[in-house]
C-alpha cells in the first residue's frame, strides 16, 4: 500500500462590494382613528414603497431581486405572516423571489438591511430589498403579546424593559445632558469623519 497525501487547497476569502442604491419611505402620519393611515394596512405601506422603488429603477429587471427582508416588531394581523414574501409578491416581484420577516425591537429594519448586505457581500445574492414597517395606529406596541411572567417575577429584567417608551424616559432621567441638539451635533460630526475617511481612501 502506498500513502496518499493531499495538499490543502486554500480558498480565497473575498467579499463582494455592497452598494446601497436607493431608499423609499412613506410620509409621517399621526396614529389613531383620524390618522392618514388609519384605514391602510401595514403590508400595503410596504408594498407602496417597494412598487415605488421598482418604478424608479426600470433598468433593473424584477427577476434580478433575489431576496426581500422586511421587519416588524408587532408581528400580528396585517403585520404578521411572512411580510417579505407577501409584500414582494403583491409588489409585483416574481413568485420565485423568496422573502422573510425580521422580529426585533427597535433595530429590525436595520437588521434586515445588514442581513441582506451580508448575503450580497459573501455572494449568496446580487440584489435584495430590505426595510421595515410598524403601524402603531393599527397595532399599538404590545398588542396581543403574552410575555412569560417569570421574566418579571424572577427579576431577569426590569418591567420597564418591555416598553421602549419607558426606556426612553429612563435615559432622559439618567442622562439629561444628552439633548437633541447634542445628539444632532454628534451625528453631523460622525458624518464629517466618514467623509474625511472616504476622501483619505480609508
Could you describe each region identified by the protein language model?
Residues 64-71:
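Short glycine-rich phosphate-binding loop at a beta-alpha junction
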Residues 22-28:
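Short polar catalytic/cofactor-binding loops
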Residues 22, 70, 130:
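Redox-cofactor binding/interface segments in oxidoreductases and associated redox assembly factors
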